[in-house]
Amino acid sequence: MTDKLTSLRQVTTVVADTGDIAAMKLYQPQDATTNPSLILNAAQIPEYRKLIDEAIAWAREQSSDRKQQVVDATDKLAVNIGLEILKLIPGRISTEVDARLSYDTEASVAKAKHLIKLYNDAGISNERILIKLASTWQGICAAEQLEKEGINCNLTLLFSFAQARACAEAGVFLISPFVGRILDWYKANGDKKEFAPHEDPGVVSVSEIYDYYKEHGYETVVMGASFRNVGEILELAGCDRLTIAPALLKELSESEGEVVRKLSYVGDVKVRPARMTEAEFYWQHNQDPMAIDKLADGIRKFAIDQEKLEKMIADLL
């Protein structure tokens, strides 16, 4: 009898949502995703201390300004962790742009190019990297510019259909619609506290995005993210990719059974609608109170963890 993780891999590319190298060795994902929170957690692992020390030493060589050293060391640490992970996976690493730049297109592009250069200088080609950006209008515009320059992007903190549509129209490589955080919001703000997997609002959101992309022939990859339970994952079997935390990878690997494909599209490709304007994007996105709350909340949380990481680095400088 096969286990569910092995079975899931037959219909979906499995990605590890972690910065933990031990988890990569154990579950052997195709790709891996990191974010400021995961980098902060990874930085606490004793085996990573040498990566922190190396990042700090490198930053000292780049500038004598302490503030700049902190920024440089934080960027280099994220890349160092990415480099270690790339030794263990055949595919791509996603590394995130500072969430505090989420409303600044030019600064996001500049930071993305800086991260790419750090990877390139370490011998890693663009084909193995995804730059993560928040799915704000400004982040989507930054991604469109980067894609034209051969830098593929992963648009994260995606909660609304408007965000998904704008990403497809901008030609971004991949989106990460969040499942669990959508469920969290509905549990916290509605009367219903329990949802069957097929009616889970996060699952419904990703399913609708997947269908829309396939119906209209968009090549943007849909990678479901932020899962709260195995039921959500199994309900999205067949999605292009799913990025899954180690605890849920473990649960899947220890469960026997065949996974049934739930998402697929067979049919004619429909004519795409005219491209959204910025005004239309904001109007449609702002019709969704959950998406407004969770996008802002996600940016705040990533920014807080980025600041914690910078403080940790500053204390070591």
From Swiss-Prot:
Belongs to the transaldolase family. Type 1 subfamily. It catalyses: D-sedoheptulose 7-phosphate + D-glyceraldehyde 3-phosphate = D-erythrose 4-phosphate + beta-D-fructose 6-phosphate. The keyword Chloroplast does not apply. Its main location: cytoplasm. NCBIfam families: PRK12346.1, talAB. Pfam families: TAL_FSA. The active site is at K132. It is found in: Cytoplasm. Pathway: Carbohydrate degradation; pentose phosphate pathway; D-glyceraldehyde 3-phosphate and beta-D-fructose 6-phosphate from D-ribose 5-phosphate and D-xylulose 5-phosphate (non-oxidative stage): step 2/3. One of its GO terms (molecular function) is transaldolase activity. One of its GO terms (cellular component) is cytosol. This is Transaldolase 2.
